[in-house]
Amino acid sequence: MSRMCELTGKAVLVGNNVSHANNKTKRRFLPNLCQVTLISDVLGQRYRLRVSAAGLRSVEHRGGLDAFLLKASENELSQRARLLRRQIIKKTAEAAAAVAA
């Protein structure tokens, strides 16, 4: 399991600790990841994802998991999140076709 947000793609960064004397030592900046259970309204299921705190704020800002995944680009999502996105698109298309018929 990599230290990467499944929704935003936020991952580990590498930089330096810089002392007062300007000595530099390598360090890693780890993302603030949390195991979160998010509910899909369209699919009617709960999904457990590893999401950064900033990613969770983005999900809430966009109005939930479904809205976030529909607006997100595929290249920043994890494989599992891409699958969820495709399922949501398929389900909404089926619902729209049922209403039209």
From Swiss-Prot:
User: Which GO cellular component does the record give, naming just one?
Assistant: cytosolic large ribosomal subunit
Q: Does the keyword Magnesium apply?
A: no
| Tagged with keyword Ribonucleoprotein | yes
For this UniProt record, the keywords arranged alphabetically read as follows:
Ribonucleoprotein, Ribosomal protein
List the GO molecular function terms. structural constituent of ribosome
> InterPro entries recorded for this chain?
Ribosomal_bL28, Ribosomal_bL28/bL31-like_sf, Ribosomal_bL28_bact-type, Ribosomal_bL28_sf
Organism domain of life: Bacteria
Signal peptide span: none
What Pfam families does the annotation carry? Ribosomal_L28
Give the matching PANTHER family: 39S RIBOSOMAL PROTEIN L28, MITOCHONDRIAL, LARGE RIBOSOMAL SUBUNIT PROTEIN BL28M
The entry assigns this protein to a family as follows: Belongs to the bacterial ribosomal protein bL28 family.
Question: HAMAP family annotated for this entry?
Answer: Ribosomal_bL28 (MF_00373)
What's this protein's name? Large ribosomal subunit protein bL28
